[in-house]
Amino acid sequence: MTGTIRIIGIDPGLRRTGWAVIETVGNSLRFIGAGTVRSNDKADLASRLCQLHDGLAEILHLHMPQEAAVEATFVNKDAVATLKLGQARGIAMLVPARAGLRVAEYAPNAVKKAVIGVGHGEKRQIHMMVKVLMPKALFDGDDAADAIAVAICHAHHRQSPAWRLALEAQP
């Protein structure tokens, strides 16, 4: 596994889905771009999911990543909100999968642990460490910063023996 690998990290959300593209060569990381795909909260659910789909598809076409990582969603007390978030996450997984990318999933605490060293941290800690790890990173809010963290997490985990075995097992 040598050479440059371009990774897209995605932090799914129905209102705002964060995305970030980084490159990894060995242990070094390079920031490519980050941002947020927004859906119109006045539109119906199907239209909002289409907006997320089209926005992510455009990002993939523009940046041509080779691997994708999506943050797993959590279940909260509002079942309807959790279901909608799950649908947005489905779009976040579908778009790169349809583009032929392998899609890895990471729990929020795994992302935090990879970036700040502990599984339970605050948003400001993630922002601070993203800036330390990638000083040239520019992001327009929490969602894009979280997506950078997801991409960094994947860059670290993709070098693990378990990830290599998973890649070898797939055609």
From Swiss-Prot:
Q: How is the cofactor bound?
A: Binds 2 Mg(2+) ion per subunit.
What does the entry list as the binding residues for Mg(2+) 2?
A: 71
Q: Might you give the EC number(s) for this enzyme?
A: 3.1.21.10
Which ranges form a coiled coil?
Answer: none
Annotated InterPro entries: RNaseH-like_sf, RNaseH_sf, X-over_junc_endoDNase_Mg_BS, X-over_junc_endoDNase_RuvC
Identify the residues that bind Mg(2+) 1.
11, 143
Entry's Gene Ontology BP terms:
DNA recombination; DNA repair
- Could you describe the subunit structure of this protein? Homodimer which binds Holliday junction (HJ) DNA. The HJ becomes 2-fold symmetrical on binding to RuvC with unstacked arms; it has a different conformation from HJ DNA in complex with RuvA. In the full resolvosome a probable DNA-RuvA(4)-RuvB(12)-RuvC(2) complex forms which resolves the HJ.
NCBIfam families listed in its UniProt record: ruvC
Q: Which family does it belong to?
A: Belongs to the RuvC family.
What name does UniProt use for this protein? Crossover junction endodeoxyribonuclease RuvC
Source organism: Chelativorans sp. (strain BNC1)
Q: What is the lineage of its organism?
A: Bacteria, Pseudomonadati, Pseudomonadota, Alphaproteobacteria, Hyphomicrobiales
